[in-house]
Every structure is written in structure tokens, then in C-alpha cells.
């Protein structure tokens, strides 16, 4: 739209949406705060009630919620696992102050997210950003209905996590032999032995354990990874007692085609209800890959607010799929997440300002720059 003023663009965009989708109007007004109602009124966006649609407006973000999904095979509810505080921040070169991390997590806890991965109980020699794991775990306010898992690569880390108050843990494996040696300094087989000790101890204490499989769609050292290899590692983790296996496109090279082939293989051994996907957006395929997974029966998705992240052992890998962008897509599909998009955007704005970064979320960029 060239040099058209942003306010005019805003009005034109909404008017186009009105012509194409016929929002409901007055019945929504009571659910909006005065500022949101004023914005809608000024943009002349209220229209007669049309059954089948509903609108939620947060700041400058308007999401059309379809009552019935427009695509087949999608779940009604999608659980979002927010990994920003751990996977998102671990690659930041400048150490983020502990009080900022705590405030960040507390803000995320007020968004409706039900799972927030808090930190990693790893050696500070390997991941300096996570050196304050105990202080962060003890410092956050744990909200009712929100789970706060932590990453524990070995038995020592597990015991430290439990002492700090952790009630859920995760272990981080790989489908690539080279990546396993670079990331956790041992072979896949050796890592499985360590994880078995951790998961066994966790089960003994009634602490749920989640398993990650990195490099599920490609490795920075080995290139392509066969679906069979991903299946083997996933089956081992599931068999030792991990209640959920998160399949990670660590370097973001996957496509809907490779996602489909990988999931078809893994789902022969593990039910879709025990699987999650964890997509990085290096090649801009994350949302497309997630949609493919949803259509195949997956209903758990990992993401990071503002698209935070990367990988210290995968040069050039971009951040995780942005939680804001994921929610926007899911809202548009009529899928319930229970998460407030605007509050997530606020949390993202907070952490980006704190670490002096620009958000990688397209939704946040479009909204805050409108």
C-alpha cells in the first residue's frame, strides 16, 4: 500500500476483512474493554450479528475465530508448550539478569499458557545463560493450573532441579550421532543410559518426564536424518517412561513433506496423543510444518514468544516459531488454545526490550508498527 498513512492502512485492512468475512458486532462489544471498543467504533468495524463468527480484538490485533475449523483433521484444542525462558534465552550471548527472567516467566504465567519451560539444570560451563537455574526456579510465582518443567540432562541435574522445587522435568536426546556428541558430549546410546537413570528416578518420585528428540528433520553436521532413526530414538524415550515426545526441527530445514514422512514413521510406534512438534523457522517453514502435524493428529506444539532462540551447536539456525504467530494461525483455524494473544505479545515486548532485540514475530511486528 506504498506510502499510505498507517491509520488509513489500518482502516482499509479492516474494511477489507469486513467485506470478506462479515464479523459479528454488537454482541462482542460487552466483552471488550473501552479502548478496544473505541478502536472498533472509530474504524466502523461493528456489523450486524452473523452466526458462525466471533471476534476478539487486542490492541491492534484482530483475529477472526471460525466456529468450525475450515480444514479437515484438525484437533479442537492445541496445547502450547512455551519454551522461551529456556530454549529461547539459552543462546543469548549477554547474560539476562535473573530478575528479568523471573518477571518474564511471571508475565507468561498470566497469558493462559498451561506449560512454561523455565530453565535448564545444566553445567554453567556449557550453558552460562542457565547458571542461575536454582534462583529462577525458586523465584518465580507458580500459578495454579500452570506447569513449569525444567531440562535435566543427567542425574545430578535432576537432583538439583528437585531440590529447587521442580515438579516436572525433560530430557534432551538427538536423532543424530554427531549432534548428540556436540550437544551433550556423548553418543546416542550413552545418552539413553543417562536418560533412563533420570526418568527412572523421576517416576519413583511421581515426577512427569518429557523427552526431546532434536534433529528430527535434519542435522547441521550429518544433513538428512532418516525417519527410522527418529523413530528409534523416540521409541526408546517413550519406552523408558517419557509421557510425551517432542520432535524437534532443530535447524529449521524441514518442509511439510519431510514432516509428514517423519511423523508417519514415528506414529507407527507412538500414538499421536503422546507426540509434540518443536519447529524452528530458519527457512520460514515452521507454521506450514506445524499445520501438517496438526492435520496428522498432533495437538501439542512447542513455541517461543517473539521467536526467541537458536542453537549454540547449530550455526545459522534461527529461533523457534513465535508463539504469537502460532496463536494467530490457530485462532484463524478456530482451534482453542486458552491463551490470550495480546498478553503474550506484551510478554514478548517486555523480554525483547530487556535483551535489546527486535521481535521475530510477524504478528507482533505488524501490530506494534501499525
UniProtKB/Swiss-Prot annotation:
CDD domains: DRE_TIM_HMGL. GO terms for cellular component: cytosol; endoplasmic reticulum; endoplasmic reticulum membrane; membrane; perinuclear region of cytoplasm. A lipid is attached at residue 2 (N-myristoyl glycine). Disulfide bonds: none annotated. It is found in: Cytoplasm, Cytosol; Endoplasmic reticulum membrane. A divalent metal cation binds at residues 87, 278, 280, 320. This is 3-hydroxy-3-methylglutaryl-CoA lyase, cytoplasmic. It comes from Homo sapiens (Human). The lineage of its organism: Eukaryota, Metazoa, Chordata, Craniata, Vertebrata.
